Amino acid sequence: MAGVELFSHPALHTRYRAGLCSAAALALLLIAVLTYVPPLLVAYRSHGFWLKQSAYREQPTVRFRYELLFVATTGPGPGSFLAWSTFPAFNRLQEDRLRVPLLSTREEDKNQDGKMDQLHFKLELPLQPTEHVVGVQLILIFSYQLYRMSTFVMQSMAFLQFFSPVPGSQLYANGDLKLNQRQLLNHCGLDTRYNVSVVNGTSPFASDYDLKNIIAAYRDRNVTTVFSDSNPIWMTGRGANTPFIVNATIRYPVEVILYQPGFWETIKFAWIQYVSILLIFLWVFGRIKMFVFQNQVFATTPVSPVLPLSPVLSYKQHQP
Ligand SMILES: *[C@@H]1O[C@H](CO)[C@@H](O)[C@H](O)[C@H]1NC(C)=O
Ligand SMILES: *[C@@H]1O[C@H](CO)[C@@H](O)[C@H](O)[C@H]1NC(C)=O
Ligand SMILES: *[C@@H]1O[C@H](CO)[C@@H](O)[C@H](O)[C@H]1NC(C)=O
């Protein structure tokens, strides 16, 4: 009896033998190819086989750096503004337009999880009775860190701007410091690309403090934060000797962070997809294989059922 055992199935109680180059062996090979290759094509062609991006949620570790730049517009003219910042070089450039405000800030950890949840910021700008504020531009600088996947450290800002035709007494803003991603973060490692100051406080040049240039350089970054309050509240009717007040609440919400999955995560998802489709093919082609051999579609030598001997019987047979 030539050949090797090609197929057996517990339900059939028969073994089928044939030569390695027989039609049955070729059919078996073809069935194997049809079982294992198409699931790969199906998984691949149905998109999302290789995981390109993934997401997770994390509340960032945000701290106000006690750095800010403030410009209050007092009229329509080009030089009618008052300004102050925490950068001495900027303040030196302002000369008589420099006006030091009174600041109070408080960061609050509302749920006691060790991460700050919001910043209460209040700025009181003393004004002469003849001065009026018609616009506010404010940059607050934060240190912003993510730890769950890659360690991402950056200095970022909240920019608040409001103009009104009516002189104001107070500007009230309340919003989120939202993460804005133009690029996926890494899944591991340390990323300090943007751990650079938003405002170059050591520069003596006025152009480095031009809001237009600061915003342009900041927006060039692939990862930024934006302050989301699109509708701050402008209050009018300031008393003659009262300061102009900026009152802002800046929240640090939990963010959905998009990242580039690592090698093993990519392989895992590809494997899960492949195997789940493969199971269906294994079942279907298992049936086909059984049919082909049971019905002798290709010539094979069926070997009659070898009934398992009971241990007692086999023991007795070996007795001398
Ligand atoms: C980020 O920058 C700050 C200030 O320049 C520095 O103190 C800190 O060590 C830097 N962090 C990392 C991880 O490089
Ligand atoms: C800040 O400005 C100074 C002077 O122009 C320059 O030498 C320095 O490289 C700048 N720093 C950054 C971080 O751009
Ligand atoms: C920003 O993202 C673009 C496109 O994803 C990339 O080509 C560029 O290198 C990134 N810039 C930095 C500084 O990482």
UniProtKB/Swiss-Prot annotation:
Glycosylation sites: N195, N200, N222
Keywords carried by this UniProt record: Cell membrane, Cell projection, Cilium, Cilium biogenesis/degradation, Glycoprotein, Membrane, Transmembrane, Transmembrane helix
Chief localization: membrane
Parts forming coiled coils: none
Transmembrane spans: 23-43, 266-286
InterPro entries the UniProt entry points to: TMEM231 (IPR019306)
GO cellular component, one term: ciliary transition zone
GO biological process, one term: camera-type eye development
Family: Belongs to the TMEM231 family.
Entry protein name: Transmembrane protein 231
Source organism: Gallus gallus
